[in-house]
UniProtKB/Swiss-Prot annotation:
Any Gene Ontology biological process: sex differentiation
Protein name: Doublesex- and mab-3-related transcription factor A2
Composition bias type Low complexity, residue spans: 229-239
Subcellular locations according to the entry: Nucleus
Region (Disordered): 166-259
Role: May be involved in sexual development.
A GO-annotated cellular component: nucleus
Key words of the record: DNA-binding, Metal-binding, Nucleus, Zinc
Family membership: Belongs to the DMRT family.
Length: 448
């Protein structure tokens, strides 16, 4: 039958089919290798997809246990462990928390400063707003104020002495510092108070006066110890003859206050006699501020050219200005000693009264003490001028008022409202105050 030839064909077909399958498999090998190279190891991909990285507990890791941190902090078995590694972890956590808090505070301060700049402009705008009272000034030295309120006047804060201890070593008993608030007769002039008012004072009005009174107290010092008080606040040597004439205060309070006022005058004006200063103080009603102003006005009335020994200070002139006591003929000679900075520009007014811009004493005698800028602006007028008078572009105390030995051009004799006047209205014969910095031509000061 025809069944035999069909069987070989079927067997042959069955024999050919594995070869074709092998050929097809061989043909598909390069494609699978290329796919494996492009895909990378599938085992790592499956591990990354199945096990994402989660934060682990550091304390458990220190003890060889891996545990997820989520919901584990409260139930950690080593949460109270005090070993070295766990203690280091706690310290790191504390440091990181402090850093985060500091960064938050800095960011908050920067935001506040940025808001203030948007509201008021730059730093100059902030200063102008604070000067006009728009922004309340921040209280300074509150720590020292609270300490001084709790303790007595003799605090343990280190203080600096402005006066030489060797000149005061001859006194038998030290002078006790005034504990009660000082009255107006013990108020000292600005610029002569010691730094004790800033370091140990409570910031009140009588802090500077009390510290000035208690500063010349003689205290026992060690041999060879240098004190910062070898130079007085006036910039001159404190070892003058009048410094040795200090007397001990009487037991009564009024006499002690009077002696304190006399001591202040002798410290401020060491070149004047004590008797003359007592007369001036009595003529001014025992007001130290008025007495200092009277002495300064009399010194300014004589002119700056008389600096030799022939210049005399008369108590008659001082008492005549005080207008309360009869004239006296006591006179002294003044050595060449630098006076207070800006002293010759003061007037008969009190130092605490507002200055009038068009007052006659501003331009009365510009040759008395030429402390002015080349623009002719008076330093005191700049210091006490209001911002509403067209000087908002200048900050208060912008000029130099602490340079009594340098020669400046004399101020112009007009007020701020007359700034358009010609500069030729100056005194033609006025020269420089000193030949140290002024140009000299044949020993003659250069004319303006």
């Amino acid at each position: 039958m025809d069944l035999r030839p069909e069987l070989p064909t079927a067997s042959s077909a069955s024999q050919v089919h594995p070869g074709a399958a092998a050929a097809a498999a061989a043909a598909s090998i390069p494609v699978s290798m290329a796919g494996n190279l492009l895909r990378g190891p599938p085992l790592l991909l499956r591990a990354a997809d199945k096990y994402p990285r989660t934060p682990k507990c550091a304390r458990c890791r220190n003890h060889g246990v891996v545990s997820a941190l989520k919901g584990h902090k409260r139930y950690c078995r080593w949460k109270d462990c005090m070993c070295a590694k766990c203690t280091l972890i706690a310290e790191r956590q504390r440091v990181m928390a402090a850093q985060v808090a500091l960064r938050r505070q800095q960011a908050q301060e920067e935001n506040e400063a940025r808001e203030l700049q948007l509201l008021y402009g730059t730093a100059e705008g902030l200063a102008l707003a604070a000067a006009n009272g728009i922004i309340p000034p921040r209280p300074n030295y509150e720590v020292f104020g609270s300490v001084n309120n709790e303790t007595n006047s003799d605090s343990s804060i280190p203080k600096y002495e402005l006066f030489s201890k060797s000149q005061l070593s001859g006194s038998a008993t030290p002078q006790q510092s005034v504990g009660k608030p000082a009255s107006t007769e013990s108020d000292s002039a600005p610029g002569i108070s010691s730094p004790e008012g800033r370091h140990g004072g409570s910031g009140s009005e009588n802090g500077d006066s009390e510290s000035f009174i208690s500063s010349p107290v003689s205290k026992p010092i060690k041999d060879g110890e240098e004190t910062p008080g070898s130079v007085s606040s006036l910039g001159s040597d404190s070892g003058s003859e009048t410094d040795k004439d200090d007397q001990e205060p009487s037991p009564s309070s009024a006499a002690s206050r009077h002696m304190n006022a006399i001591d202040i005058l002798t410290r401020v004006f060491p070149s004047h006699k004590r008797s003359v200063q007592e007369l001036v103080l009595q003529g001014c009603g025992k007001d130290v501020v008025r007495a200092i102003e009277q002495i300064l006005n009399n010194s300014g009335a004589q002119g700056p050219n008389k600096t030799g020994p022939e210049e005399t200070w008369t108590a008659e002139r001082m008492l005549q200005n005080a207008q309360q006591l009869p004239q006296s003929s006591a006179s002294t000679t003044t050595p060449t000693r630098p006076m207070l900075p800006g002293a010759m520009t003061l007037s008969n007014r009190s130092a605490f009264s507002p200055l009038q811009p068009n007052a006659p004493h501003f331009g009365a005698d510009p040759s008395t003490y030429p402390l002015g800028t080349p623009l002719g602006l008076n330093p005191l007028r700049l210091a006490y001028s209001a911002h509403s008078r067209g000087l908002a572009f200048m900050t208060p105390y912008s000029t130099t008022g602490l340079m009594p030995t340098l020669g400046f051009r004399p101020p112009m004799d007009y007020a701020f409202s007359d700034l358009i006047r010609d500069r030729t209205m100056l005194h033609k014969e006025q020269g420089y105050a000193s030949g140290l910095y002024g140009p000299l031509v044949n020993n003659t000061p250069d004319k303006q």
